[in-house]
Amino acid sequence: MIDTSTITNPQTLPVEAITQENLRNTLEQFAEQQKQQFIQHRPVTDLVLSRSTFIDKLLIRLWEHYEVNQYPDIALVAVGGYGRGELHPLSDVDILILSAQPLSDETGRIVSKFLTFLWDLRLEVGHSVRTIDDCIEIGNDDLTVATNLTEARILCGSEDVFQCLQERINAGNFWPSEDFYRAKLEEQKTRHARYHDTTYNLEPDIKSSPGGLRDIHTLSWVARRHFGATSLLEMSRFGFLTDAEYRELVECQDSLWRIRFALHIELRRYDNRLTFSHQPSVAENLGYTGEGNRGVEMMMKEFYRTLRRVLELNKMLLQLFDQAILDNGKTVETIQLSDDFQIRGHLIEATKPALFQARPETILDMFLHIAQNGDIEGIAAPTLRQLRTARQRLNVFLVDIPEAREKFMELVRQPNTLQKAFRLMHRHGVLSAYLPQWSQIVGQMQFDLFHVYTVDEHSVRLIKNLNKFNDPENRERHPICCEVYPRIIKKELLTIAAIFHDIAKGRGGDHSELGAIEARKFCIQHGLSRPETNLIAWLVQKHLLMSVTAQRRDIYDPEVVAEFAKEVRDEERLDYLICLTVADICATNQELWNSWKRTLLAELYYSTQKALRRGLENTPDVRDRIRHNQQLSSAILRGKGFAPREIEVLWKRFKADYFLRHTHKQLAWHAEALLTHDHDKPLILLSKKATRGGTEVFVYNKDKAKLFAIVVSELDKKNLSVHDAQIMNSKDGYTLDTFMVLDPSGKTIPENRHNTIRRALVNALTKMKSERKNKRAPRKLMHFNVKTQVDFLPTKTGKKTTMELIALDTPGLLARIGAVFAKQKVSLQAAKITTIGERAEDFFILVNEHGSPLTEEHQQALKEALIIKLTPQD
C-alpha cells in the first residue's frame, strides 16, 4: 500500500508507488476524503481549490516520472476551469502541452505515454498538444480555444515558452477586447436561448442555465480581456464591481459550487444537470429536510433565487462593460421624460444619483414611464445599480407607502404594463419589494412534471398571456379569449387576480382560499370598491373551477352546466374567468394547451352563457332537444337516400341519452354506417375532421365484459392518448362507445393512420383479446411517488356511481383500470381522462352489471382491487 500522505501530496510519490493500481486508489481515497469533508461542512471553496492543487501535484510528479522535463522548450499548462484553479469532483482536467516547435518523434512518444497513463487512471483529461503558433492560429478562429488560453496557468516546464504564449495572447491583434466582448455576448445569448431565456427549468443546468456559473465566468472573461482583471476581487479594484456586488457574486458562486459539488459526489459520470433523479439526494447532502418533497423544494427555491441574482448582476455588469468597451467616448442622445428620468439611447435612467433611496415611490414612476413609452427597452446600468441598492436598503415594503400604492394602481391600469413593465419589475425584484406575499413565492417550485415554472415565473407568464388576447394574430389559437378580453372594461381587475391566484402556494392549506383572503386585503388597502373586491377575490378563489369542470366533469350533462352557471352567476364573471383560466393553463406548461382543451372550455363557456341568458330557473326541455337533433340528422340521411322508415327502426334501438349526447351531425355519421353494416361484426369509425378538438373513435359491437379494456389497450399500443370516453349501450345490448383521442403531441390523428387503427381494433374485438405490449415507463416517472387514490363522490340523482381515481400515469394505465372493471363486474358509463404531469386524475361514471349504482361493499371491493393493480411494485 502507498503512504497515506500521498493523498494530500502526490508530489512525494516514490517511483515504486507510481502504478496504475496505486494511483487509482489514491484518487479514490482523495475523492472519498473530499466527500466526507463536504458532508462535514468544510467550505466548498477550500475543497475546489484543494482538488485543483492535488491534481497539480499529481501531474507535476508524473511529468517528472516520464522525464518530459528533460526537454527544455516544452511546458505543461492548465487551461479552462482547471486553469482558473476550479476543479469539482467530476470536472474535466484540461491541459495544454505547449512547445516552441513541433515535438520530435521521441518527445511525442514520451508525451503520449504520459497522456495514456492519465487516461488509465480514469482521469477525465481534455488535452491538446500545440506549438505557440498553433495556439494563436487556432485561437483566432475558435472562441472557446481563445477563452481557454486567457485562463492558462503553467504547472511545470519551460517558463520562457509559457511567457512567450502569454505575450502573443495579450497582443492587440489576438482577439481585441471589442471583438472578444461582442463574441462572448453572442455566445451567452445563444446559450440562454437553449434554456428558453429563463432561470426556471425543471431540470436546470448548474453551469449553463441563465444565471448559472457560466454567467459568472463570462463576466470574468470579459474583465480579464479588457481590464486585465484576473479575479472577481480585481474587478472590484478596477471599479467595475462595487464591494457589495463583489460579495454578492462570491456568495452566489459559493452557493452554486456547493450544489454542484453535492451533485458530483452523487454521480459516476460528469453532468451538471439537476435531474429529478438526483434532486432528492443533492438536497439531502446539502442538509435540506422536510416532509415528502419539502427538502427538494426548499433547495430548488434557494437555487432559483441564486440564479436570479447572478443573472441580474450579469446583465447589469455586461451593460457597464458595453459602455466602457464599445461606447467609450461616444455621445448618446438623451430625451427628458420628467425631472427624475430621461431616456439615453433606448434605456431609461434616473437623473439623480440617490433618487430611489430618497423617494422609494419613484421606483414605480420609472416603470410607469416604461409602460407608457414603447421606445424604452430596459434600464440603464447605473440606474439599475441604484435600484438594487435602494431595494436592499428598504426598511418597509413599498405597498406600505401611500404614494406607491397610487402609482401601482396607475401602473396596472396601463394597457402596455402587461407586455413589458411587469416582466422587468419581476426580473429586478420590484414586485417582491412591493408585495411581501410575492417575495414568498419567488423561486417556489413543485417537485412534479406538471408545473414547468416556479410560482412567480408562472404568474408573470400568465399576466403576459392575458396581453396576448389583445392581439388578433392569436385569434386562431384563442378564439374566445381574443373576442372576450378586448371588451373587458376593467382589465386591471383581471391583472390583480392573476398576481394573487397562486400567491399562497407553499404555505400548506388550500392556496385558492388563502389567496382570496390576501387578494381581499390588497383590494381594501388599495381603495377598490366592494364589487371590484368581491370579483377579484372570487376569481382567485375559483381560478381552477372552469378548468376542473371542463376536464373532469360531464359538461354535456345539463345538471353539470347548471351547477357551474349557478357558481358563476353572471356573464361578466364568466368572461373574466375564461380569460384567467386559459392564460393560467398556457402559463403552467406550454404543452398543455391543445385543440381538445380549447374545445372543452369553449363548449362549457357557450353552454353556460346560454344557461345564464335563459335564466337559471328555466331548464331546457329534454324532449325538445332530442326531437330537434333527430329532425336535423334525419334530413341529412334522407338527402343521402335513406328511407325514413329504416332510420326510425334503427333509432328505436337507442336510448334517449344517445340523442342528447351527440350532435345531429354525429347521429347522421353513425347511422349512415350502421344502416349498411353487418351487425355480427365490429364497426369502428374514426372522424376525418377534428371533433371537439380531437379524433373521435366510435365503437359499435355486441357488448362484452372486457370490451373497454381491449379498446383502450389497442389505442395505447398505437401510441394514442384517450382524453374522454362516452360509454353507452343500445336497448338490445350493443355498444355505442365514443373515445376522444389525440396523438402524443396533443394533435388529431392524421387520416393516413385511420385504416391501421381501425383494423387493429376490429381484429382485437373479433378475438376479444388484446396482446399486451409492455412499455417502459419514461425515465422521469421513475422518480415520482404518486399514491393511488380512489374516491367515490356523491351524486344528486343517486342513479349512478361517480368515482375519481388518482394514480401514477404509467403506460397502459387505462387498460389495467378496464381489466379491473371487467373482473369486478362494473360497467363504465363515461370517463374523463386528465393527465397532470406525472399524475393521472381520472373521473368515471359507473353502474353494476344490472345497471344500478354500486353498493358500499362493491365500492370498497373495487377500490381495493384498483389500488392493488395500480400501485407500482418495487
UniProtKB/Swiss-Prot annotation:
Uridylyltransferase (UTase) activity is inhibited by glutamine, while glutamine activates uridylyl-removing (UR) activity. It catalyses: [protein-PII]-L-tyrosine + UTP = [protein-PII]-uridylyl-L-tyrosine + diphosphate; [protein-PII]-uridylyl-L-tyrosine + H2O = [protein-PII]-L-tyrosine + UMP + H(+). GO terms for molecular function: [protein-PII] uridylyltransferase activity; phosphoric diester hydrolase activity. Keywords: Hydrolase, Magnesium, Multifunctional enzyme, Nucleotidyltransferase, Repeat, Transferase. Residues 696-779, 802-874 form the ACT domain. InterPro entries: ACT-like_dom_sf, ACT_dom, HD/PDEase_dom, HD_domain, NT_sf, PII_UdlTrfase/GS_AdlTrfase, Polymerase_NTP_transf_dom, UTase/UR. Its EC number is 2.7.7.59, 3.1.4.-. Residues 337-695 are annotated as: Uridylyl-removing. SMART domains: HDc. Its cofactor is Mg(2+). GO terms for biological process: regulation of nitrogen utilization. PROSITE patterns: ACT, HD. Residues 455-577 form the HD domain. It holds the Pfam family HD. It comes from the Bacteria. Residues 1-336 are annotated as: Uridylyltransferase. Signal peptide: none annotated. Modifies, by uridylylation and deuridylylation, the PII regulatory proteins (GlnB and homologs), in response to the nitrogen status of the cell that GlnD senses through the glutamine level. Under low glutamine levels, catalyzes the conversion of the PII proteins and UTP to PII-UMP and PPi, while under higher glutamine levels, GlnD hydrolyzes PII-UMP to PII and UMP (deuridylylation). Thus, controls uridylylation state and activity of the PII proteins, and plays an important role in the regulation of nitrogen assimilation and metabolism. Belongs to the GlnD family. Has four distinct domains: an N-terminal nucleotidyltransferase (NT) domain responsible for UTase activity, a central HD domain that encodes UR activity, and two C-terminal ACT domains that seem to have a role in glutamine sensing. PANTHER family: BIFUNCTIONAL URIDYLYLTRANSFERASE/URIDYLYL-REMOVING ENZYME, BIFUNCTIONAL URIDYLYLTRANSFERASE_URIDYLYL-REMOVING ENZYME. This is Bifunctional uridylyltransferase/uridylyl-removing enzyme. It comes from Photobacterium profundum (strain SS9).
